[in-house]
């Protein structure tokens, strides 16, 4: 029991103790708010650190996998990921603590309002005694003055009338003084009683407040302590793993994985030449003038073993590149009897009259040549499209017998390694289907002519699939993360990239070319495209622009408790300009201002426009829309800079704005998750429940390309799963792949992934699983876009959302 400090120490001459205690109670609300801000700042720091650690773990997985040191990176990666998860877990606990403090603050405000009403009587008593004290002091001073005046008149021998008059005033002052003394006594008694009760009430409130605040601080310190214990365990595990990763084990693993065989070269004995089997008239071999030393073509005639004198040789003529020139012989006889090929390596000289020398085309199995030909075919086909108003047509026929050599003459191909780098986000239906499989087969096999019109430089056509992002293989799903792009103008390399979509997330500029008919037939787009849009007409034409709305949903599920789900949804808007528009902007000193409106923003918490290029009016009062306009001078300068960096690009992308969507916990996740682990020394049972949540989307859409990855330790020897999964023993991860989930799926999009693992070094430790999916044609926020004013038209709008970090713990 705390002593009554407030009752004993807040009286005083001026009776101001009540005012001090009341304001002290109000200061408790300020301290509660400041404590919440402090915890929130700590959570922000921990979240930033967790993101940095996750990025570091991802970079560790991208380091060189060559050499004996390569397995050590897996140890670093695992340890760093666990550290990141520790700090992420602390973030979750701190966010829960913040909610608790905020709830307490709301209750505190209500309690203080109630207390204010209860102590209103004490406030009146304080005011009464203060006013009575002042009146008493004045009456006392008046009484003393009248008494002194009466005595002075008596001593000075004043008239009787003056003395009587002074006596009346003195008596009146005496009565007033006595009256206020009595009033003060009553006010004092009432004040002391009420002030004692109120002071004790204020002390009780402060005790309760401080106890609760100390509990919050205790929860904070315990959370930090637990995380530090986990971090210590992670470091201890890292030390043990490094101790177990011996030099011998690293060398042994490298030898087993990269070894070239255990068989040593055998003995070869000298064999005498069998001269009896030699044939007369054998032709000698002679090295050509352009031959490379050490490279000798095998003999086609096994009997050529003797070398007669050089005088008996017939040396054929060679051209400037070193190839043998075909002699003038009977062509018919040659076709009937002989057909040989010669490479650019060393070869023997044979009699010209018996051979026909030809250079065959490159073997079709050459993968690099094939990829390059397909790339150039894509570029060639991408520049052939149907014009909306066909005036002149030129028939183009693509024959079956076009050789790879003929196709490669059209345009230099992109590097083949860039052709395979397509991830889930790169399957962009807005920009046309992939030409890797369909174009090379269906288009090249067409024998009918198609009326086409070649595109000008500034023509807008639906672009091909983006090839700017690497494929997220199942082995790298554990590092799923989307890092927002800064608004600063991106740096474009000087080398010409392969044709890519104008709205690809990883590029600021790209070249767009594909078949408009294919895109219209196979691509579900949002909005209406007017097809190719030439921008070389004049300044009075409406100029085409394309827009992409891309959102990323990040979620963290903890067991089956929906209240512990953490969700963050962000989005960005990218605008794409055709290259021909730069000439229109530069030729016109005052181009039309591009104004646009973002609609359905009621679910957005924050909108961050690109401050360098975009303006907005902060005084707009409409809660569901917001208007913006672009700084056309800055846009022109920026587009010219992009054009100088990459003059071959057909389109240039501009980051317009970014935004954050308000979330309501698990109700805002399109795919709900819950994980259950049952771990024993010999087996581990895993179940992942998932449920399609249409309420998270404004318009329910299909989730496609779902991938689930679960790390499982404990020395997995065998895995049984339903539906079938893939076990990667090297990475110790199980992978599930589902094509799509929607309301029309079985059980309304609900289901389970089950697996049983047989262990040799159990038990396993429950880990965090990661999920990836995407959805085309809609957004989670329902945000929409429209142009305002004249001078521009919206040729294409694309909407999509995909996962960022989508994790689940047990």
UniProtKB/Swiss-Prot annotation:
Residues 87-156 form a coiled coil. Residues 3-274 are annotated as: Mediates dimerization and binding to membranes enriched in Pi(4,5)-P2 and induces their tubulation. Residues 542-809 form the MHD domain. It is a peripheral membrane protein. The modification Phosphoserine is found at residues 312, 387, 394, 403, 488, 493, 496, 508, 510-511, 533. The modification Phosphothreonine is found at residue 385. Homodimer; disulfide-linked. May form homotetramer. Interacts with AP2A1. Interacts with EPS15, EPS15R, ITSN1 and ITSN2; recruit those scaffolding proteins which in turn may interact with the adaptor protein complex AP-2 at the plasma membrane. Interacts with DAB2 (via DPF motifs); mediates LDL receptor/LDLR endocytosis. This is F-BAR domain only protein 2.
């Amino acid at each position: 029991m705390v002593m009554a400090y407030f009752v004993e120490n807040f009286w005083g001459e001026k009776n101001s103790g009540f005012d001090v205690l009341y304001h002290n109670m109000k200061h408790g609300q300020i301290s509660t708010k400041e404590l919440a801000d402090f915890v929130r700042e700590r959570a922000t720091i921990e979240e930033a650190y967790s993101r940095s650690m996750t990025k570091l773990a991802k970079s560790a997985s991208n380091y060189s996998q060559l050499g004996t040191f390569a397995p050590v990176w897996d140890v670093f990666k695992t340890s760093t990921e666990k550290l990141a998860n520790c700090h992420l877990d602390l973030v979750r606990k701190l966010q829960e603590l913040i909610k608790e403090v905020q709830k307490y603050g709301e209750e505190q405000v209500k309690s203080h309002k109630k207390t204010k009403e209860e102590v209103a009587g004490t406030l009146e008593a304080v005011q009464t005694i203060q006013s009575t004290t002042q009146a008493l002091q004045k009456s006392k001073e008046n009484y003393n003055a009248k008494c002194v005046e009466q005595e002075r008149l008596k001593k000075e021998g004043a008239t009787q009338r003056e003395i009587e008059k002074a006596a009346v005033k003195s008596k009146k002052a005496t009565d007033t003084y006595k009256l206020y003394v009595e009033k003060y006594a009553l006010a004092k008694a009432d004040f002391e009683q009420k002030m004692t009760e109120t002071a004790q009430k204020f002390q009780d409130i402060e005790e309760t407040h401080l106890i609760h605040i100390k509990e919050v601080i205790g929860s904070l310190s315990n959370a930090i302590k637990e995380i530090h214990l986990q971090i210590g365990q992670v470091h201890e595990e890292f030390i043990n793993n490094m101790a177990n990763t011996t030099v011998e084990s690293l060398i042994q693993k490298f030898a087993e994985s990269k070894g070239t065989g255990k068989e040593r070269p055998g003995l070869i004995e000298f064999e005498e030449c069998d001269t009896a089997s030699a044939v007369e008239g054998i032709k000698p071999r002679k090295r050509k003038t352009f031959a490379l030393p050490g490279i000798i073509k095998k003999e086609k005639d096994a009997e050529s073993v003797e070398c007669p004198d050089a005088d008996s040789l017939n040396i054929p003529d060679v051209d400037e590149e070193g190839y043998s020139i075909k002699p003038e012989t009977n062509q018919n006889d040659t076709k009937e009897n002989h057909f040989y090929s010669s490479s650019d390596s060393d070869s023997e000289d044979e009699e010209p009259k018996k051979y026909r020398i030809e250079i065959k085309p490159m073997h079709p199995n050459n993968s690099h040549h094939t990829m390059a030909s397909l790339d150039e075919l894509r570029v060639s086909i991408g520049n052939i499209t149907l014009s909306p108003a066909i005036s002149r047509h030129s028939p183009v026929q693509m024959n079956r017998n076009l050789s790879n050599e003929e196709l490669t003459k059209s345009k230099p191909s992109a590097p083949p390694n860039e052709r395979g780098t397509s991830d889930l986000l790169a399957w962009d239906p807005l920009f046309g289907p992939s030409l890797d499989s369909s174009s090379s087969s269906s288009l090249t096999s067409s024998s009918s002519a198609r009326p086409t019109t070649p595109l000008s430089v500034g023509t807008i056509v639906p672009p091909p699939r983006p090839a700017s992002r690497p494929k997220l293989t199942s082995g790298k799903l554990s590092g799923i993360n989307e890092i927002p792009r800064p608004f600063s103008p991106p740096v474009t390399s000087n080398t010409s990239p392969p044709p890519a979509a104008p709205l690809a997330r990883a590029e600021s500029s790209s070249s767009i070319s594909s078949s408009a008919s294919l895109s219209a037939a196979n691509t579900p787009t949002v909005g209406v495209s007017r097809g190719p849009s030439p921008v070389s007409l004049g300044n009075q034409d409406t100029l085409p622009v394309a827009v992409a709305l891309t959102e990323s949903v990040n979620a963290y599920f903890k067991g089956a408790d929906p209240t512990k789900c953490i969700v963050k949804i962000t989005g960005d808007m990218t605008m794409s300009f055709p290259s021909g528009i730069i000439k229109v902007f530069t030729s016109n000193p005052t181009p039309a201002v591009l104004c646009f409106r973002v609609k359905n923003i009621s679910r957005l918490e924050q909108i961050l426009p690109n401050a360098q290029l975009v303006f907005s009016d902060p005084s707009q009062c409409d809660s569901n829309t917001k208007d913006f306009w672009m700084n056309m001078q800055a846009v022109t300068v920026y587009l010219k800079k992009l054009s100088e960096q990459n003059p071959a690009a057909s389109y240039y992308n501009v980051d317009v704005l970014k935004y954050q969507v308000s979330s309501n916990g698990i109700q805002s996740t399109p795919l709900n998750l819950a994980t259950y682990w049952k771990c024993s020394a010999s087996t581990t049972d895993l179940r992942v429940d998932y449920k399609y949540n249409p309420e998270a989307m404004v318009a329910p859409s299909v989730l496609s390309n779902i991938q689930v990855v679960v790390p499982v330790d404990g020395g997995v020897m065998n895995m049984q799963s339903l539906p079938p999964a893939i076990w990667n023993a090297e990475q110790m991860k199980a992978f599930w792949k589902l094509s799509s989930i929607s309301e029309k799926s079985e059980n309304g999009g609900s289901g389970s992934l089950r697996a049983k693992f047989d262990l040799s070094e159990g038990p396993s430790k429950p880990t965090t699983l990661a999920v990836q999916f995407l959805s085309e044609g809609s957004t989670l926020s329902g945000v929409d876009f429209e142009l305002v004013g004249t001078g521009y038209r919206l040729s294409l709008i694309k909407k999509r959302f995909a996962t960022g970090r989508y994790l689940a713990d047990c």
